């Protein structure tokens, strides 16, 4: 995926790569010592940021519209939730194996995820209203989860850009391994539930083990944001093809939705 050209044969070998530091300086209007402009057709940090805002906007707008639709059509909560989830999974698989489709399919994926977010949010809100938490808490937990998600995003982005967090190879390996382990647990739970009608004990309960596992999932989901930031920066430095801007934005949206649902 990364360029493998011999750097000694490249005319722009000494061009300063685009990084978060230079990007922030440019946003503040400061002078940045850079060489020739990025060649057309390659990934840039600004392009990835723009694509991320577009996908996030589409997802948020669809989620809000979906929430309003479900409120007036409560019987549609499950069709909207499962429809968005299935569409999202199918599109995610296509984009993952065919990154060149990202500029076209990532916006559609964002819309599908927005529908899923609306549906799953309504499910959690309805559950909260039926408990001793009280009816007003139903919509309150949705707002709090969204606020926490964007708060974590902002905090980790600040920590990354100021280099308080430096994703070393061991860090990346550890986060990837933990993510794979969580994915395996989710798949195992799905199979056990569908085939035998049972659940994995303790980790899905409201007891200490269940709460600890839920907290662990939130932490790993949040740390995946750091890997997304690193991928965007490394992609710009290595001048990946332009369509990787949308692929990187797609990956960031996947992590954000996972983080939001985990917080719920």
Language model features: what each stretch is:
Residues 1-264:
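A hydrophobic alpha-helical transmembrane-helix feature that marks the membrane cores
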């Amino acid at each position: 995926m990364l360029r493998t050209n011999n750097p000694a044969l490249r005319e722009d070998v000494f061009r300063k790569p685009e990084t978060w530091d230079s990007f922030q300086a440019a946003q503040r209007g400061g002078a940045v010592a850079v060489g020739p402009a990025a060649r057309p057709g390659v990934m840039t940090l600004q392009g990835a940021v723009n694509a991320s805002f577009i996908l996030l906007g589409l997802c948020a707008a669809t989620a809000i519209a979906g929430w309003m639709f479900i409120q007036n059509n409560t019987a549609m909560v499950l069709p909207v939730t499962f429809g968005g989830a299935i569409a999202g999974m199918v599109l995610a698989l296509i984009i993952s194996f065919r990154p060149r489709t990202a500029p076209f399919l990532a916006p559609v994926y964002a819309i599908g995820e927005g529908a899923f977010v609306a549906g799953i949010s309504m499910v959690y809100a309805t559950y909260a209203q039926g408990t001793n938490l009280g009816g007003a808490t139903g919509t309150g937990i949705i707002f709090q989860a969204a606020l926490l998600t964007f708060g974590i995003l902002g905090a980790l982005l600040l920590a990354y850009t100021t280099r308080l967090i430096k994703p070393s190879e061991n860090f990346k390996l550890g986060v990837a391994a933990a993510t794979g382990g969580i994915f395996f647990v989710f798949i195992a739970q799905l199979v056990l539930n569908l085939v035998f009608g049972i659940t994995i004990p303790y980790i899905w309960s409201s007891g200490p083990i269940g709460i600890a596992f839920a907290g662990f999932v939130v932490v790993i989901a949040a740390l995946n944001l750091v890997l997304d930031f690193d991928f965007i920066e490394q992609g710009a430095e290595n001048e990946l093809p332009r369509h990787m801007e949308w692929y990187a934005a797609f990956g960031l949206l996947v992590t954000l939705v996972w983080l939001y649902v985990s917080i719920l």
